[in-house]
C-alpha cells in the first residue's frame, strides 16, 4: 500500500525515505452540461421534413417545431393540416416595437412641420394682439371704476345689515339672560302662588278624595297653646264631628252604671 504524498515528503526531508513515488494522475473527463432544447430522437421518430426539429420550451414546458432555415415555428407538426407556421413571439414583439418607433418618428416629423406653420401664422397675429391689449386695458379701467362703486355700495349694505343683526342679537341675548335668571332662581317671587296651585295633589291627602280643605305643610302638627283634649282637629265635614274621645275610666264607669240600671229594673 503506497504512503500518502504528504507523509512521503516529510520522511524524505528527514532522510528516512529516499525514493518518492510519483502522484497518480487523475483522468479528467470533460462533459457537456449545456442543455440542448432540440429533441433529436423525437425528430427522427416523427420523420419531420428537412430543417425541421422538435424543440422543448422550458418556459411553458411544452414542445414546439422549429425550422432552422426560415426560423419559423409551429405548435403542431408540419405534417398536421391544422398547423400554423408563424414567427416566434419574441420576433413578433421586436418587429412590432420597430414599427411603433418608425410611426412615432413620422408623427414627430409631422408635428415639427405643424409647429413651423403655426409660428408663421403667429407673426401677423402679434399686431392684432397689441391692439386687443389696448382695448382690454381701457375695458379694465372702466370695469375697475364700476367695481369700486359696486364695492362701496356693497359695504354700505353690509354695514346696515350688520347693525340690524347686532340689534336683534342684543334683544335676543337680553331675553335669554332673563329666562336663565328665572330658571336659576330657587323660589321666584312672582310665581310662588302659581307654582303652589300647579303642584299635583297627593293621592293620600283627604282633600284629593273628599270635601276636606287642602292642608299646608304645618297642618296636623301640634300647636304650642292648644289643649290636649284628644279631639281630632283635622276631621271636618258632615261625616266627621269634632268631639273628644272618652278615657278608659269613663268607659268603665259608664258600663257599671248601665249594669246597675239593668239590675234595678
Curated annotation (Swiss-Prot):
UniProt xrefs under SUPFAM superfamilies: WW domain
Region 3 X 2 AA tandem repeats of [DE]-R, residue ranges: 139-144
Transmembrane segments: none
Sequence positions bearing Phosphoserine: 94, 247
One Gene Ontology term of the molecular function aspect: ribonucleoprotein complex binding
Domain WW: 46-80
GO annotation (BP), single: positive regulation of defense response to virus by host
Repeat region (Sequence), residues: 104-110, 111-117, 118-124, 125-131, 132-138, 139-140, 141-142, 143-144, 150-151, 152-153, 154-155, 156-157, 158-159, 160-161, 162-163
Segments for region (5 X 7 AA approximate tandem repeats of D-R-[SG]-H-D-K-S): 104-138
This protein's GO CC annotations: cytoplasm; nuclear speck
Region Important for interaction with TXNL4A: start-end pairs: 245-255
Residue ranges, annotated region (7 X 2 AA tandem repeats of [DE]-R): 150-163
Name of the featured protein: Polyglutamine-binding protein 1
InterPro entries: WW_dom, WW_dom_sf
Superkingdom as given in the UniProt entry: Eukaryota
UniProt note: domains: The WW domain may play a role as a transcriptional activator directly or via association with the transcription machinery. The WW domain mediates interaction with WBP11, ATN1, SF3B1 and the C-terminal domain of the RNA polymerase II large subunit. Except for the WW domain, the protein is intrinsically disordered.
Ranges where the record places region Disordered: 94-265
Oligomer status and interactors: Interacts with POU3F2/Brn-2, ATXN1, TXNL4A, HTT and AR. Interaction with ATXN1 correlates positively with the length of the polyglutamine tract. Interacts with RNA polymerase II large subunit in a phosphorylation-dependent manner. Forms a ternary complex with ATXN1 mutant and phosphorylated RNA polymerase II. Interacts (via C-terminus) with TXNL4A and CD2BP2. Interacts (via WW domain) with ATN1 and SF3B1, and may interact with additional splice factors. Interacts (via WW domain) with WBP11; Leading to reduce interaction between PQBP1 and TXNL4A. Interacts with CAPRIN1. Interacts with DDX1.
Primary localization class, coarse: nucleus
Amino acid at each position: 500500500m503506497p504512503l500518502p504524498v504528504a507523509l512521503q515528503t516529510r520522511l524524505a526531508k528527514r532522510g528516512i525515505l529516499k525514493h518518492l513515488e510519483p502522484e497518480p494522475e487523475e483522468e479528467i473527463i470533460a462533459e457537456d452540461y449545456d442543455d440542448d432544447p432540440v429533441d433529436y430522437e423525437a425528430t427522427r421518430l416523427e420523420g419531420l421534413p428537412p430543417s425541421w426539429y422538435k424543440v422543448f420550451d422550458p418556459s411553458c414546458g411544452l414542445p414546439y417545431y422549429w425550422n432552422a432555415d426560415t426560423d419559423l415555428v409551429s405548435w403542431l407538426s408540419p405534417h398536421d393540416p391544422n398547423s400554423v407556421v408563424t414567427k416566434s413571439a419574441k420576433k413578433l414583439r421586436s418587429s412590432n416595437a420597430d414599427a411603433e418607433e418608425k410611426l412615432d418618428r413620422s408623427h414627430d416629423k409631422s408635428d415639427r412641420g405643424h409647429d413651423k406653420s403655426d409660428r408663421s401664422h403667429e407673426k401677423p397675429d402679434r399686431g392684432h394682439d397689441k391692439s386687443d391689449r389696448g382695448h382690454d386695458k381701457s375695458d379694465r379701467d372702466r370695469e375697475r371704476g364700476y367695481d369700486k362703486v359696486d364695492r362701496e355700495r356693497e359695504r354700505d349694505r353690509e354695514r346696515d345689515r350688520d347693525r340690524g343683526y347686532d340689534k336683534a342679537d342684543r334683544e335676543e341675548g337680553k331675553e335669554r339672560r332673563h329666562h336663565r335668571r328665572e330658571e336659576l332662581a330657587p323660589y321666584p317671587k312672582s310665581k310662588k302662588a302659581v307654582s303652589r296651585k300647579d303642584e299635583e295633589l297627593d293621592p293620600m291627602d283627604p282633600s284629593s278624595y273628599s270635601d276636606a280643605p287642602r292642608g299646608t305643610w304645618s297642618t296636623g302638627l301640634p300647636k304650642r297653646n292648644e289643649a290636649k283634649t284628644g279631639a281630632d282637629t283635622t276631621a271636618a265635614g258632615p261625616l266627621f264631628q269634632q268631639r273628644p274621645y272618652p278615657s278608659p275610666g269613663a268607659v268603665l264607669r259608664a258600663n257599671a252604671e248601665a249594669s246597675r240600671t239593668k239590675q234595678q229594673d
